[in-house]
């Protein structure tokens, strides 16, 4: 399978490939680690925070909890709609409690992180502290995460490597693999 080079990033578009994406997650791990803050669980927001949350959980050797949220739906995930927050958090054992690191891919408008923080305060009294970590923080975000890797003053659209799957269907995957085999 031939991999096409990424377009050049500019003030309006930030193009991120798989290698850069994974390196960015590792650099965010370093930012959180070097802060010295000790937390008990990682809570990632599905879907954008799933990959970073998984990496954080593995590296810090802490339980991973998942909270599903959704707001980007229309036009292959590029238009923000109403925010939906799942009622329940998925955890492998016990409950969500103690100091929680909330992980997502980015702070765009800030609405998701802000509402999730309030959701946790209202519904999870055993959570004693929540801090947030994202790879990218846009200047337009009304919510400033505790930890972020990159501040984006021009608010570009971030083209993440997995976005190609937003508009891909099974028959397209089959055709692509057939061409590659």
Language model segments and positions:
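PRPP-associated nucleotide enzymes
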Residues: 1-181
């Amino acid at each position: 399978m031939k991999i096409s080079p990424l377009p050049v990033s500019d003030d309006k578009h930030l193009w991120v490939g798989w290698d850069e994406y994974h390196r960015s997650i590792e650099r965010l791990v370093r930012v959180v680690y070097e802060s010295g803050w000790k937390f008990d669980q990682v809570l990632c927001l599905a879907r954008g925070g799933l990959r970073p949350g998984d990496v954080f959980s593995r590296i810090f050797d802490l339980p991973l909890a998942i909270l599903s949220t959704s707001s980007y739906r229309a036009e292959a995930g590029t238009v923000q709609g109403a925010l939906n927050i799942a009622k329940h958090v998925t955890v492998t054992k016990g409950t969500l409690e103690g100091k929680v690191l909330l992980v997502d891919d980015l702070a765009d408008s800030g609405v998701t992180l802000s509402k999730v923080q309030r959701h946790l305060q209202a519904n999870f009294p055993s959570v004693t502290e929540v801090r947030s970590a994202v790879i990218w923080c846009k200047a337009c975000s009304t919510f400033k995460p505790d930890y972020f890797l990159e501040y984006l003053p021009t608010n570009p659209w971030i083209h993440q490597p997995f976005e190609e799957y937003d508009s891909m269907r099974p028959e397209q995957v089959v055709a692509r693999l057939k061409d590659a085999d």
